[in-house]
Regions:
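An N-terminally focused, membrane-permeabilizing/fusogenic/translocator signature enriched
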Residues: 26-28, 64
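Structural signature of tandem-repeat unit edges
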Residues: 8, 12, 17-22, 31-60, ...
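Short beta-strand element of the conserved SAM-dependent methyltransferase core
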Residues: 24, 137-138, 144, 185
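N-terminal low-complexity, Pro/Thr/Ser-rich intrinsically disordered segments
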Residues: 1-9
Length: 189
């Protein structure tokens, strides 16, 4: 596979010319919107980028892509993104809200949102994947946040009621810390 890293619109991407895909690999620190002293309200991950007049679908967010970036309070991840790698948003202290619009694979026990102030998730995907994502957050000691009970999870209005009842309307346990977390589930998307 032939890949190249290119700078486009404030981000670096690793592109694959063969299948016209791109993985957001890191921020461009020279871009003024990512200065440490500036907090943006919203960061929208693009669904595509261009290189040499060719369009590339943004399909992933790389390992540590936004690590220790404090420039945004929320991130909106489009349907084109199908994976987020470990530590992608590690230590993003300003991050409070994540919108995940598609069927994203998030590796287990990899601290994608560790050491953030995440208090709200908007999840448009599969309910069972959401359950395992939340279970991973609660059971992973390194990413456990004491205020998870205060976290609100927004899901689609048309979500399967039986799946919601079976997977989300019960506490998730952290056996090592002897804790149970009951997320607030809101069907409003």
């Amino acid at each position: 596979m032939n890949t190249n890293e290119v700078n486009y619109d404030g981000f670096f991407y690793t592109i694959n010319p063969e299948d016209k895909t791109a993985v957001l690999s890191r921020t461009n620190s020279s871009n003024p919107q990512f200065r440490q002293d500036q907090v943006l309200l919203d960061l929208e991950i693009p669904s595509f980028m261009y290189y040499n007049d060719e369009k590339y679908a943004v399909t992933g967010i790389a390992d540590s892509a936004f690590r220790e970036c404090h420039a945004f309070e929320s991130v909106d991840i489009p349907t084109s993104v199908v994976f987020i790698l470990r530590s992608a948003f590690l230590h993003c202290k300003s991050l409070k809200k994540v919108i995940i619009r598609g069927e994203v694979e998030i590796p287990l026990f990899k601290g994608v949102f560790t050491s953030t102030n995440l208090s709200e998730i908007h999840w448009y995907g599969d309910i069972i994947k959401l359950y395992f994502f939340l279970k991973n957050m609660v059971s992973n000691e390194s990413s456990f946040h004491p205020d998870y009970d205060a976290m609100t999870i927004h899901i689609r209005k048309d979500s399967d009621e039986a799946a919601v009842t079976k997977w989300l309307e019960r506490p998730i346990r952290n056996h090592e810390k002897h804790l149970e977390v009951q997320f607030k589930i809101v069907k409003d998307l």
